[in-house]
């Protein structure tokens, strides 16, 4: 046993060193979502339901956009492992161009969705709340894309603390802004849900400017900036980023869609079910963000080792990652299960919503290990740049399995919210197993010199 531990000890330590700042940044986002839900929920249950609908629609496109930026981590990480500093700067120029195009495309899609929002079957009384909040979120979308473009650069060169501090500061600013704008403090009018949206928009804009400013004006990045200044937007780099980024974006987008599109089904069950669904989404993000924070460190370390062609270290990094993810799954899940009857009361005073939350925590508990498994090995595949299988695996797991089962359990069998959530363990566990299988297959091909 001690021999096994010594084999992975260095990888545990390095993954923890890289992963903890990412996890803290992710938890900062969770705390922000928690605070948003808490503050909006205590202001109005109707506003909480409207926020649930809009946030789930935007979560889908934001996760898609972030997934697209994850191509940068793989490319930058491999170049960093090869100590090609100037080349990283060149790649970042093409990465910024590619992600700006993605921001424009996603914004156009959301405008079309806004124009048809009344056709999506949501309660009529929520539409006056949904529309202005939707538009405010739309304005901030490009800034999310730009922030994450440069965040993946700092993660790829193993400087994960930069994004952590910016995220923490931005989230503190957002929560303070919520307090001022939702409830009308410091002489400002009480804006409710619109105030929450404005606070989020302002913090996202500020974080993007700070992140980009650090890249261009920090002395420790001057060699990378030199590569940016001397380089051009190259078709080959633009294409490579797109070819890697689209599968990653689709994989993450389809997973998120299983949750976001389930909100449409939950909306059919009424405002209280939708409010409970929003509370559960906030809770579920705890495990996901912790797992994905550590798994992102797995992707960074693996990409560095891929640049060095140290395939034994690649394997041990992925294995050490799953050990740590499963440990984190236990540490996060048990307290939530113990407190399941009181968690809903933190968000709302509505007795029916609290009861639905306590019941829905059961399927949430079931899928934690499947979620950890898929986070770890999806990122292991990302680190090896073996991303094409991610598309069909995610499609089968979430669109062929999870969403239809959600409709079967929730609508046909009439288990409603709990039924919809009982579909998630099937999709997440299936995806985790398939990612593991195709990670192993892809790495064997790389080791043998074959193309993947």
Region roles according to the model:
Residues 1-22, 76-142, 188-246, 302-367, ...:
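Short alpha-helical transmembrane segments in multi-pass integral membrane proteins
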Residues 7-38, 42-43, 59-71, 75, ...:
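N-terminal transmembrane alpha-helices
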Residues 17-36, 136, 170, 203-207, ...:
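Transmembrane helical elements of multi-pass membrane transporters/channels
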Residues 26-30, 63, 103, 107, ...:
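Residue-level hotspots within the lipid-embedded alpha helices of multi-pass solute transporters
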Residues 27, 31-49, 117-124, 180-191, ...:
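Helix-terminus/linker motif at the lipid-water interface of multi-pass membrane proteins
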Residues 45-56, 130, 134, 197, ...:
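Small-residue hotspots at the loop-to-helix junctions and early N-terminal turns
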Residues 48-111, 144-163, 263, 276-340, ...:
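Small-residue-rich hydrophobic transmembrane alpha-helices
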Residues 69, 73, 137-156, 163-171, ...:
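Short runs within selected transmembrane alpha-helices of multi-pass transporters and secretion channels
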């Amino acid at each position: 046993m001690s021999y096994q531990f010594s084999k992975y000890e260095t990888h545990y330590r390095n993954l923890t060193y890289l992963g903890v700042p990412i996890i803290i940044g992710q938890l900062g986002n969770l705390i922000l979502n928690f605070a948003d839900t808490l503050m909006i929920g205590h202001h109005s249950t109707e506003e909480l339901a409207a926020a649930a609908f809009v946030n789930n629609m935007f979560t889908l496109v934001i996760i898609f956009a972030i997934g697209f930026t994850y191509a940068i981590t793989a490319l930058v990480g491999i170049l960093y492992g090869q100590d090609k500093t100037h080349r990283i700067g060149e790649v970042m120029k093409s990465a910024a161009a590619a992600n700006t195009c993605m921001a424009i495309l996603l914004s156009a899609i959301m405008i079309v969705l806004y124009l048809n929002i009344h056709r999506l079957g949501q309660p009529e009384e929520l539409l006056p709340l949904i529309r202005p909040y939707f538009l405010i979120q739309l304005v901030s979308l490009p800034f999310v894309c730009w922030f994450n473009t440069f965040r993946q650069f700092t993660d790829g060169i193993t400087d994960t603390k930069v994004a952590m501090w910016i995220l923490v500061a931005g989230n503190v600013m957002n929560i303070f802004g919520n307090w001022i704008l939702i409830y009308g403090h410091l002489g400002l009018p009480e804006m409710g849900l619109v105030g929450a949206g404005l606070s989020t928009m302002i913090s996202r804009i500020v974080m993007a400017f700070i992140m980009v400013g650090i890249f261009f004006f920090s002395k420790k990045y001057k060699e990378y900036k030199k590569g940016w200044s001397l380089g051009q937007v190259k078709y080959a780099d633009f294409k490579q980023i797109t070819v890697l980024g689209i599968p990653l974006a689709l994989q993450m987008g389809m997973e998120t869609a299983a949750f976001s599109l389930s909100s449409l089904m939950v909306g059919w069950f009424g405002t209280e079910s939708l409010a409970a669904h929003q509370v559960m989404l906030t809770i579920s993000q705890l495990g996901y963000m912790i797992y994905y924070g550590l798994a992102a460190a797995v992707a960074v370390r693996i990409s560095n080792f891929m640049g060095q062609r140290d395939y034994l270290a690649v394997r041990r990094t992925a294995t050490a990652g799953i050990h740590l993810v499963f440990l984190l799954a236990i540490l996060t899940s048990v307290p939530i299960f113990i407190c399941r009857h009181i968690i809903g009361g933190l968000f709302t005073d509505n007795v029916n919503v609290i009861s639905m939350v306590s019941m829905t925590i059961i399927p949430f508990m079931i899928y934690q290990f499947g979620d950890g498994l898929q986070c770890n090995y999806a990122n292991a595949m990302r680190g090896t740049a073996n991303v094409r299988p991610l598309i069909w695996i995610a499609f089968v797991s979430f669109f062929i399995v999870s969403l239809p089962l959600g409709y079967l359990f929730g609508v046909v069998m009439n288990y409603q919210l709990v039924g919809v959530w009982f579909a998630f363990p099937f999709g997440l566990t299936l995806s985790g197993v398939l990612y593991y299988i195709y990670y192993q297959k892809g790495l064997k091909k790389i080791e043998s010199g074959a193309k993947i």
